[in-house]
Amino acid sequence: MPPFSARAASARYAVCRSRTAVHGGDNVVLTEVRSRQRETLAAVARHARSLAGAVADDSELMRLLGGAEFALLGEASHGSDEFYRERATITKRLIVEHGTVAVAVEADWPDALRVDRYVRGLPGDANGNEALSGFRRFPTWMWRNTAVLEFVEWLRGHNAALPPAERVGFYGIDLYSLFSSIDAVLAYLDREDPPAAWRARRRYACFESYREDAQAYGYATRFGMSPDCEDAVVAQLRDMLSHRAAQAALEARGDAAARFHAEQNARLVRSAERYYRTMFGGRVASWNLRDSHMVETLEALRHHLGTARSAAPRIAVWAHNSHLGDARATELGEHGEWNVGQLLREGHGNAAALLGFATDHGSVAAASDWDGPLEIKRVQPGLAGSWEALFHDTGIARFALLLRGSGELAQALAMPRLQRAIGVIYRPETERQSHYFMARPVQQFDALVHLDQTRAVEPLDGSEPHPPGEPPETWPSGA
């Protein structure tokens, strides 16, 4: 992949501007820009695969995703109904026709575990709405919405016809549940290994004075006002991972999954402790730590699910484009950020298939500020010079672009343009500054779906503030 450079892109436009002195004014430059715009638009229109029905009806796209071990299914916002429903339809086909065995979402491990137990038919919640009530932090609508509920109920029905060992799981890959994960580790050890639980309590006691405010822990340790808990949480994780004899005994009686969940919560505590200490040092370091944890979780999940299978397990991942598109193809990568899409491509090559989504206008469920109430907001049409505006100008309401090895299309899309990202916060009054960055989707994704008009998700209930001591699920970026 050629290195991305927003500065180089800006320099090209500066050269064009400078040529006005030689060629007699702005008209020459405007003619060149408009000619390039027409060529790019024509190339997109030629290669656009119009979608009359569901995105999953495109057989070539499904062949690309179905052949991957990691099918990364993005979204351009956290509050657009179509993105959730199209991902759900794609995932159903991946499960039924291509053997996908896990759905991993941009959510915390303990919250998703309730859903996992429900879809597997294990004791606990009586229905999908109850199972999704574990998602209590802002923004509740991100996973507590009708599209997710319908998928969860479908997955439970699908699993009911399968032997327990073949049922498809539902997992969280994010890292915000520091205290929930501590509680989960202790509860597991209290039940399975009381001496180990005593050791874990001594280690995790380091957090006691910050139980109501994990961000205060991060601030105090970052600026030297309090010792950190890094050694304690690392020691606890090592302790759990070293007890392979206990693991073997659990496998013998069918409880290996419980042990894996406990180990993953210990990993999350380790990552969350680092994250809180890093979050006051700048966006790039905290973002990179978060996405590294997501990839570590996916790799651990892949290993866990693969122990009982002859072939590598296939996993569908639901998260924002900003996590799943290759960061190296964006100006964010130029600033030092990496993400899930980049790391999985580097580690697995074409075994990771990256699907992005885009929209031009419509409505979205979002807040104006952190912990603010849910609002249904109008999505502004894409800015001039953006990919969203270009896709809108094709006049095709719904289409897919297959970008991997796309030849002519790749050449036409080589110049970076603005790309929009709406997280859980949407501020149309500062649209350019808050929601756009430069990107080259032809290197960012293996395929891209444009849905010209989208509507807001339907929440199952009103927005609620996050529990004390834990930040919103998408702090600090909204994605």
Residue spans for each PLM region:
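Low-acidity, Ser/Thr- and Arg-rich intrinsically disordered low-complexity segments
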Residues: 5-19
